[in-house]
Amino acid sequence: MNPVENLAALRAEMAKRRIDAYVVVTDDFHTSEYVGEHFKAREFLSGFTGSAGTLVVLPESAALWTDGRYFLQASQQLDGSGIELMRMGEAGVPEIPAFLHDNVPENGFIGFDSRTISNDFARRIGEKVSEKHIRFAGDEDLVDLVWTDRPALSCEPLWELEPKFAGYTRAEKLEKVREKINELGADVFVIPALDEIAWLLNLRGGDVLYTPVFLSYLLLERGKATLCVQKEAVSAEIEAHLAADGVALAPYDDIYPLVASLPKGTRVLLDGERANYRITQSVGTGVETIDRPSPIQLMKAMKHPVEQENERIAHIRDGVAVTRFIYWLKHTIGKEPITEMSAAKKLESLRAEGEHFLDQSFGPILSYGAHGAIVHYAPTEESDIPMEPHGFCLADSGAQYYEGTTDITRTIALGALTEEEKRIYTLVLRGHLQLGAAKFLHGCTGETLDMLARAPLWEAGLDYNHGTGHGVGFVLGVHEGPERVHWDVNRQKRHCVIEEGMIFSNEPGMYLAGKFGVRVENLVVVRKAEENEYGRFLALEPLTLVPYDRDALDLTLLTSRDVELMNDYHAKVYAAISPYLAGDELAWLKDVTAPVTFG
């Protein structure tokens, strides 16, 4: 079946139930950004494969909302589907609640699978449509009725992340989170977020490709904890270790009756942005709900010193692999056939040679030429093209190691470049260097820092339609919150102060449709710079250690400060990576990291 047929089948089920609009999100039951194959309902119905987007199906039409990272990709993948692309954030594009208000009749029904819609999203829809007495029909997953060959729920084995990697023991983390629960006046904390559960219990799994989490919910009380999980995924040894820390097991789907059975007078902590609508609707009468951001988010984001040191180790391993890849690509292009997919496989194989490599941290975004303008382009058998000894290769990739999670982008000159290509690369790199060198007072947020990265592009009347930075988990998701670097306060759901120990990306870019794309990305860790009578100053330490491409630079556009920053960074790269290279690779690294003279 194709998207047109899939939508027709869904509309037939909607008509049987008198449903006027059906909402299909990207999320799983845990509001995850990246989901297992079972949960790719929006992709099944629309054909759009991006990691962010919401589909609304009406009886005679459909629309899909996505953000600026995916405008070009979505326009291509939705072509011929009959689905209208809604470019989020652009003038005249309605938000989904307003669209539903305008397109669902009085006393109508909006359908969705209430296990996949966050409580906050359902609340915003409900508030907007209430004046028309529109009701929800959220008890049935209609997509499941029409997706006849739907993959089963993943159930991969759990494994333990030792404290020598994680820093805190499971018991220490449970104690710290219980302290937060008490501070918030709650008796029970319902935790649906997969990354938060994995972090808290020092467990990892394999139920989401590239993200080592496992399908589960956790009920944390003052004296006990209940992990709702597929028991087949838990070994007897891990079950015993959990029991020793006061964590009992229950079936995965028991979360709803467990929440419903909480006695009157119980105060339940729930994060309405992370909890699905069915969980919140399961809370019984007389039970008080405390809807607050999960305290685990910030605890997880502020990396333990042991995690930070492990991340440095992981990034040296990763830096060696990516540096060797760039050397191979530059010295092989034009001599042997190389395509986007073959280059991606080469990069993965080089990483796999490293110690403690577990997997990639996301599907590689490896593009050549015009494909680079598709921000999250991923090569497929159908889209794969050969690379030629000119223009840019944009390589955005990452890995999971026992020591941490990596994410790096390098835009690589494969030969001759146009003046425009060099100009854009240089402007992007200048912004990247400026943000990387930031020194700022504690209290700044990502909105404060973002302009440092965009300033060179803004001065030229240019911009990129994505955030400059996102948090990164520790052997977890390559995207995590609560920190985010983006200037537009209207896009921020929650404003987060940048704290010591946070790890986030520094990745400005620029994309010219039909021509090329440029992005340069390092991960950085926030460290204390100094404290004096003016306050506590923080700075950013680069974790990523891979050379920039001097072949892509227009040196006339660099300031003396730019050159100083680049030279300092390249000195760090050479010191960290050179001990692991030899022969021609080492000689090349020495050459490409040698100091540049200004002027």
Enumerate the predicted regions with their spans:
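Active-site neighborhoods and metal-handling regions in enzymes and metal-associated proteins
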Residues: M1-G599
